[in-house]
């Protein structure tokens, strides 16, 4: 019979392996990449994930708009991918086999007026990354325009904790979740207000995804300290207790713990 310590280590390795498989870690897949947004990536701001200014949110220029096959109707927002150029290394790819890791921050819509191999790069079922230009130039030459790539899901490395920006008004609370480490994407969000005597006081209430990574609650939360429970795409959950104090205001951002 194996010693208890060895059994514990084996169990931990099994859990880690399952999480890695859930993220698709190590599973290189074929796709294509183009670029947009200009040399400073200013044209990538905003986007279908709702992150707004990608500089101030910490995503910088290492970002990508995903095609329909990858975007998953917005549930992939915040996920991270490692890409390497797989084209003609003399004409398209940079030498040395460099890779770049990007965060999904936008949607690359299909263009059915053009064929998939002639301008409709993001048409289903193509797995396509429209990279911020600086990210593209880390693996390929500008003149290439479009290159075949190999890609895989990877864990997201973030500085600081998960951030919650509370927008909206009384009875309509729209919470933007950013800077999520690990899986990066958010599959569910719940809110709990402090105290008791209301629908959310002292108990968890699920929020519904409005768009991108904006999550909605129609409860009256004013004057209550807010706790959030985040469940990521790999099934892991994180509770950030009383992350917003009772005197919070709409438009403020609060930072909690990290995965």
Swiss-Prot record:
Expansin-like CBD domain: residues covered: 171-256
Domain Expansin-like EG45, first and last residues per copy: 46-161
Induction annotation: By gibberellin (GA3) and wounding.
Topology in membrane: Peripheral membrane protein
Residues of the signal peptide: 1-22
Gene Ontology CC annotations of this record: extracellular region; membrane
CDD domains assigned: DPBB_EXPA_N (cd22274)
BP GO terms, sorted: plant-type cell wall loosening
InterPro entries registered for this protein in UniProt: Expan_Lol_pI, Expansin, Expansin/allergen_DPBB_dom, Expansin_CBD, Expansin_CBD_sf, RlpA-like_DPBB, RlpA-like_sf
PROSITE patterns: EXPANSIN_CBD, EXPANSIN_EG45
Subcellular location: Secreted, Cell wall; Membrane
Tissues where this protein is expressed: Expressed in panicles and flowers.
Keywords: Cell wall, Cell wall biogenesis/degradation, Disulfide bond, Membrane, Secreted, Signal
Family from the record: Belongs to the expansin family. Expansin A subfamily.
The protein's name: Expansin-A6
Source organism per UniProt: Oryza sativa subsp. japonica (Rice)
């Amino acid at each position: 019979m194996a010693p208890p310590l060895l059994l514990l280590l084996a169990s931990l390795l099994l859990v880690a392996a399952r999480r890695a498989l859930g993220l698709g870690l190590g599973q290189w897949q074929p796709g294509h990449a183009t670029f947009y947004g200009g040399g400073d990536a200013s044209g990538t701001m905003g986007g279908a994930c709702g992150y707004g200014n990608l500089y101030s949110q910490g995503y910088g220029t290492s970002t990508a708009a995903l095609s329909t096959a990858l975007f998953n109707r917005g549930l992939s927002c915040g996920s991270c991918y490692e890409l390497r150029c797989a084209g003609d290394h003399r004409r398209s790819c940079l030498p040395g086999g460099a890779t770049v890791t990007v965060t999904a921050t936008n949607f690359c819509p299909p263009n059915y007026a053009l064929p998939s191999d002639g301008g409709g790069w993001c048409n289903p079922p193509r797995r396509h990354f429209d990279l911020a230009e600086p990210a593209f130039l880390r693996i390929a030459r500008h003149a290439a325009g479009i290159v075949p790539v190999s890609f895989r899901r990877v864990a997201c490395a973030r500085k600081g904790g998960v951030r919650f920006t509370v927008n909206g008004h009384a009875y309509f609370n729209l919470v933007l979740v950013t800077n999520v480490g690990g899986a990066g994407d958010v599959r569910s969000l719940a809110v709990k207000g402090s105290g008791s005597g209301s629908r959310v006081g002292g108990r968890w209430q699920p929020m519904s995804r409005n768009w991108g990574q904006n999550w909605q609650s129609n409860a009256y939360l004013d004057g209550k300290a807010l706790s959030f429970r985040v469940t990521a795409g790999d099934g892991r959950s994180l509770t950030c207790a009383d992350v917003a104090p009772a005197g919070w205001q709409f438009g403020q951002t609060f930072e909690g713990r990290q995965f």
